[in-house]
């Protein structure tokens, strides 16, 4: 295999410079500022600040409301990942069997991914609004008292549904690509041997989708931790009674609403460490069970 040699020694650095600049500006600089702010205590107007060391971290980790947000985040992330990946795999399997109009169905499935998180949240809020929502009216007609603005469990179900619906399209794309990469000869051979559809799926298709599933597991975890702020802010605002206040929403609430910048910065640092540790754990242990090829 012939190696690529750049005639100009500066050219490789120029090619990677835009990515490095963006990474420094949008990751390393904010991360360093958050780390610095987490060791300071400022007044509400930002006129004075004092170095307090790890006092902000100690206060955050001993705060019951923060521990509640951690529990809410775990529940929300697990449910969102399971629902979005499960439905995406089901829809991808169904779309892969379509003979006519396959491109149309796949295009329609991808469209929800273009919807902004806040817009996705508002769509679901309108459908399940206890006062004027069509689906909430159907629930009440069937004897189900639906009011996510007062019931924390119902609020959690609503934000999970909105977040999962938003992410299904992304997962669908990768599952369809994974299904197309599976040799049809394997499925035909299993069919000749008498294996039914469900058996072929669980013994052949699903194991071969393990790399795709693992990748999506990492992506969906990061998505649930960071990219669902707009949905929660639009639908519940972290309520009722902080039942849907995730870690990222608490960072916003304490920093921009309560103006407790030191605590908010400490929470953002802890959140960053949690996501890095969780991703490293998934790559370290989960990937061992993934077989490529």
From Swiss-Prot:
Keywords: Cell inner membrane, Cell membrane, Membrane, Transmembrane, Transmembrane helix, Transport. It comes from the Bacteria. Its main location: membrane. It is found in: Cell inner membrane. One of its GO terms (biological process) is transmembrane transport. This is sn-glycerol-3-phosphate transport system permease protein UgpA. InterPro entries: MetI-like, MetI-like_sf, UgpAE/MalFG_permease. It holds the Pfam family BPD_transp_1. It comes from Agrobacterium fabrum (strain C58 / ATCC 33970) (Agrobacterium tumefaciens (strain C58)). The keyword Transmembrane applies.
């Amino acid at each position: 295999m012939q190696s690529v040699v750049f005639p100009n020694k500066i050219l490789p650095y120029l090619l990677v410079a835009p990515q490095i600049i963006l990474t420094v500006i949008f990751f390393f600089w904010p991360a360093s500022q958050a780390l610095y702010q987490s060791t300071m205590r400022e007044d509400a107007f930002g006129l004075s600040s004092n170095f307090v060391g790890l006092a902000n971290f100690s206060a955050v980790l001993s705060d019951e409301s923060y521990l509640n947000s951690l529990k809410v985040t775990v529940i929300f992330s697990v449910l969102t990942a399971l629902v979005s990946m499960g439905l995406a795999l089901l829809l991808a399997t169904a779309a892969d069997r379509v003979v006519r109009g396959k491109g149309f169905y796949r295009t329609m499935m991808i469209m929800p991914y273009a919807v902004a998180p806040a817009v996705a949240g508002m769509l679901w809020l309108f459908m399940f609004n206890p006062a004027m929502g069509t689906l909430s009216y159907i629930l009440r007609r069937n004897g189900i008292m639906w009011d996510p603005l007062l019931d924390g469990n119902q609020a959690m179900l609503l934000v999970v549904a909105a977040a999962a619906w938003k992410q299904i399209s992304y997962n669908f794309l990768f599952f369809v690509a994974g299904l197309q990469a599976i040799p049809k000869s394997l499925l035909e051979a299993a069919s000749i041997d008498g294996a039914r559809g469900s058996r072929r799926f669980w013994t052949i298709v699903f194991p071969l989708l393990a790399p795709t599933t693992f990748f999506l597991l990492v992506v969906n975890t990061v998505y649930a931790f960071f990219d669902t702020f707009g949905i929660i802010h639009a639908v519940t605002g972290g309520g009722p009674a902080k039942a849907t206040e995730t870690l990222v929403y608490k960072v916003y609430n304490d920093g921009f609403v309560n103006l407790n910048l030191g605590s908010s910065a400490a929470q953002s640092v802890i959140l960053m460490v949690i996501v890095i540790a969780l991703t490293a754990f998934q790559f370290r242990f989960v990937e061992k069970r993934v077989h490529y090829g």
